[in-house]
C-alpha cells in the first residue's frame, strides 16, 4: 500500500512541476516601440470606427476609448484566436452610438521575441488622448471636404491642406489617384498618407475612393491594409447627416486583357460584384429612399472601363434617385447638370486637381462650393431637396 502511494506521488510530480512552471511570469524588458505613423481614422460610420497606426518594432495593440473623456473601454483585435503581432495596427471599434464624441488612446506593447512559450515582451508606447465623432444620419446638417488626384505631389497636398477649413470639416474625402503607382510602404506614407494626415490629424476621418492608378504597382495589392474598412472592400455606404453617401470603385481605365497589365487584372468580375452590391443596396437600404440627399463618390466620372459600357450603372443611379455624383480623374473641373440630353438624372461634378470642394448639406439644400488653392471660387452648386 505504501509502495503504491509512493509510486502515485512520483507519477504526479511532473504534472505538478509543469503546472507551477506554466504560471511563471514571462520576461519584460526595458524597451518600448516608437509610434512612427498615425494614429488616423478611416471611414468612420454611425456605429463603427477604424483606427490605424504603425510602430518601428513588432508589437501588440489595443485602444482605450469611451464616450466623452472616459477611456474605460478596451478594444483589442484578434485573428483566429490570436492577438496580432506586427508593426501595422488596425483596431475596429464597434457598437458605438451615432453622433457621439469619443475619446481614445492607442497603446502598442512591444513583443521582443515571439517564443512558443513565454514570449519576451517590452513596455508600452501610447498616443492620445485623441477624439472623434461618429456619423449620424439623424443630424440635420453635415459639412465635409473633397480633394482629388494629388499624384504623389506633396507640395500640392500641402497647398490643399492650407485651403481647407479644417474647423468646419467633419471628414475628408480623397477621390483617388493619390499615386502614379504604388511601389512600397515608404512611398505610400511619404507621397500621400503622411502629408495628408498633417492636415487631418488623429481626430477627423479619411474617406478614400480608389482611383485607377491605385491598381498599379507591386504594392497596390496591399493598399487596403492602409485604408481598411469594416466592409473589407473599396465600395460601401455611409450616412452623414442628411446625406446618404455611396463610395464606389471605378476600377481601371482600360480592358483587363490590355497587354500593359500582363493578364494580372480581373476588374470585370470585380465590377460585376460591385454592381450587384449597388443594385441590392439601393433597392433594400431604407436610407436610400429616406435620406434628403443621395451622393455617389467615385474616381472616374465615366464609371471606368466596363465591358458592356456604363449603361447599367447610370440606370441604377437614375432609378435610385441619386442627386449628385462627385468624381475626379480628369485633372480639371467640369459640371454637367441632369437632363435627358445627357442620359443621367443626377448632377455630375468633376473636381480639378488643385481644387477643394466643400459640401454643406441641410435637410432642405445641398450646396457645393469649389475653390482653387488660392481661395478663388471656381463654381457653386445648390441642389434643393426633391
Identify the role of each PLM range.
Residues 2, 19-146, 166, 361-386:
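Acidic, histidine-bearing metal-coordination/catalytic regions of metal-dependent phosphoesterases
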Residues 5-15:
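Bacterial N-terminal signal peptides
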Residues 53, 102, 149, 172, ...:
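Divalent metal-coordination and catalytic microenvironments
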Residues 106-133, 186-283, 312-318, 324, ...:
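Extended active-site neighborhood of metal-dependent phosphoesterases/phosphodiesterases
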Residues 107-108, 250, 297-301, 329:
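Short, well-ordered beta-to-alpha junction loops that form the rim of enzyme active sites
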Residues 140-215:
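Conserved, compact domain cores that house catalytic/ligand-binding motifs in diverse enzymes
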Residues 145-148, 171-177, 204-212, 295-299, ...:
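Active-site neighborhood of phospho(di)ester-bond hydrolases with catalytic His/Asp-centered motifs
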Residues 176-179, 282-305:
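Short acidic, glycine-rich surface-loop motifs adjacent to enzyme active sites
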Amino acid at each position: 500500500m505504501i509502495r503504491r502511494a509512493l509510486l502515485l506521488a512520483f507519477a504526479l510530480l511532473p504534472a505538478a512541476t509543469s503546472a507551477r512552471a506554466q504560471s511563471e511570469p514571462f520576461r519584460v524588458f526595458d524597451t518600448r516601440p516608437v509610434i512612427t505613423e498615425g494614429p488616423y481614422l478611416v471611414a468612420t460610420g454611425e456605429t463603427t470606427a477604424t483606427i490605424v497606426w504603425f510602430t518601428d518594432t513588432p508589437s501588440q495593440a489595443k485602444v482605450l476609448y469611451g464616450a466623452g473623456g472616459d477611456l474605460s473601454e478596451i478594444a483589442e483585435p484578434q485573428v483566429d484566436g490570436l492577438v496580432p503581432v506586427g508593426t501595422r495596427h488596425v483596431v475596429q471599434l464597434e457598437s458605438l452610438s451615432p453622433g457621439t464624441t469619443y475619446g481614445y488612446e492607442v497603446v502598442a506593447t512591444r513583443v521582443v521575441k515571439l517564443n512558443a512559450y513565454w514570449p519576451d515582451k517590452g513596455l508600452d508606447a501610447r498616443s492620445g488622448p485623441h477624439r472623434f465623432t461618429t456619423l449620424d444620419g439623424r443630424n440635420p446638417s453635415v459639412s465635409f471636404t473633397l480633394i482629388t488626384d494629388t499624384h504623389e505631389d506633396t507640395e500640392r497636398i500641402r497647398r490643399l491642406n492650407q485651403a481647407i477649413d479644417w474647423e468646419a470639416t467633419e471628414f475628408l474625402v480623397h477621390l483617388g489617384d493619390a499615386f502614379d503607382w504604388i511601389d512600397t510602404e515608404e512611398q505610400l506614407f511619404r507621397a500621400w498618407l503622411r502629408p495628408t494626415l498633417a492636415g487631418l490629424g488623429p481626430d477627423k476621418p479619411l474617406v478614400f475612393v480608389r482611383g485607377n492608378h491605385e491598381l498599379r504597382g507591386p504594392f497596390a495589392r496591399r493598399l487596403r491594409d492602409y485604408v481598411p474598412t469594416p466592409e473589407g472592400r473599396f465600395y460601401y455606404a455611409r450616412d452623414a447627416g442628411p446625406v446618404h453617401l455611396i463610395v464606389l470603385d471605378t476600377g481601371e481605365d482600360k480592358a483587363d486583357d490590355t497587354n500593359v497589365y500582363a493578364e494580372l487584372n480581373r476588374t470585370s468580375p470585380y465590377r460585376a460584384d460591385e454592381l450587384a452590391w449597388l443594385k441590392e443596396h439601393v433597392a433594400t437600404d431604407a436610407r436610400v429612399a429616406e435620406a434628403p440627399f443621395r451622393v455617389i463618390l467615385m474616381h472616374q466620372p465615366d464609371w471606368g472601363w466596363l465591358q458592356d459600357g456604363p449603361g447599367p450603372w447610370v440606370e441604377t443611379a437614375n432609378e435610385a434617385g441619386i442627386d449628385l455624383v462627385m468624381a475626379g480623374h480628369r485633372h480639371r473641373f467640369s459640371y454637367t447638370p441632369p437632363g435627358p440630353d445627357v442620359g443621367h438624372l443626377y448632377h455630375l461634378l468633376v473636381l480639378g486637381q488643385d481644387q477643394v470642394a466643400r459640401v454643406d448639406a441641410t435637410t432642405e439644400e445641398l450646396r457645393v462650393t469649389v475653390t482653387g488653392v488660392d481661395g478663388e471660387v471656381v463654381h457653386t452648386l445648390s441642389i434643393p431637396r426633391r
